[in-house]
């Protein structure tokens, strides 16, 4: 019979199975190929997905530190090659693969990442964005590259040969390996912060796709696009084309070509200036000679020898114009006088004095009518006031007192109207027509109702 102690807990069984997985040397390093399923990119976090074929599926997890080393972006349905270890997740009891490395099945991981980024930036229009023109005669050129490679030597040699008056400033950078992309971005920012450079040359010599990879990083490409200073990219050999080459303002096949694009040939420019100076001198001399010839011709002309003949014909015209002007002025004054006289006659006919006199008559008549209306109104008001006074007099208390009546108040001047208001021996006051009588209540008798 099975004892209770023979039963395992779920935790104990799960831990036992997990130990089996982790101790199995065949499961400690597993190479899998399959199709990505249930993948949703989680920025700056662990990635959870499944790997499947046509018959089976296994859960997969890739920690953030391992996923940051993946050069391409995994996509749903993509076939990949995975290296990892198999273990069991105790909380769910599911076994899964912990992915340590992943790359596309078929294409190399770097090439896949290159194509993905190239398509992304092309969709954003970064490759077709307007390019900054290079400064024709640069004073200062910033070079971002390795301080020990052949690139900087070629650029220095070419620049000194072609345009020695330009100042080259090296911004040393790591151009391959981990951290190189961050250094390149930082150097681009430093050059732009200085603000006194005319051109930037960024690049390195040839190498494998892994060696050139920092120049295919998205952050480097965006730093080049954001640069306010024109950027010449010279990465790898002529057959190598990096993302940096595609977004730069100008791409150079070699470092020497980059220096040639950045600088003119000083001797050629001096020769051009000399030729332009000679052409300018010849043109100026020709113009001076032509003007001198024209001046001599004018000085010897018949007209200039007798200049009065130039304006003899105009003097007669001036006299005629003066006479016509005088006649026109006189006629204009005559017309204006006639107009003034006519206006004066009209004003006299419509003199304001007549209007004022008529207005005075109107005002006098209005005052007369107003006085009559006021007199009628006052008489009417006096009559109505007399009627009101007579009506008031009929109901006046004094009038009633005059007919022999009186009214009684107590010592507080309160009106006493009923028998109940009087008290025996209460002092009272009788108000009569011509004065006041003080009395005292002896007795009260209530009359019949």
UniProtKB/Swiss-Prot annotation:
Keywords: Cytoplasm, Exonuclease, Hydrolase, Nuclease. Signal peptide: none annotated. It is an enzyme of class 3 (hydrolase). Its EC number is 3.1.11.6. Transmembrane segments: none annotated. It is found in: Cytoplasm. The keyword Nuclease applies. GO terms for biological process: DNA catabolic process. The keyword Hydrolase applies. Its main location: cytoplasm. One of its GO terms (cellular component) is cytoplasm. CDD domains: ExoVII_LU_OBF. It catalyses: Exonucleolytic cleavage in either 5'- to 3'- or 3'- to 5'-direction to yield nucleoside 5'-phosphates. Pfam families: Exonuc_VII_L (PF02601), tRNA_anti_2 (PF13742). GO terms for molecular function: exodeoxyribonuclease VII activity; nucleic acid binding. It comes from the Bacteria. Heterooligomer composed of large and small subunits. Belongs to the XseA family. Bidirectionally degrades single-stranded DNA into large acid-insoluble oligonucleotides, which are then degraded further into small acid-soluble oligonucleotides. NCBIfam families: xseA. This is Exodeoxyribonuclease 7 large subunit. It comes from Latilactobacillus sakei subsp. sakei (strain 23K) (Lactobacillus sakei subsp. sakei). The gene is xseA.
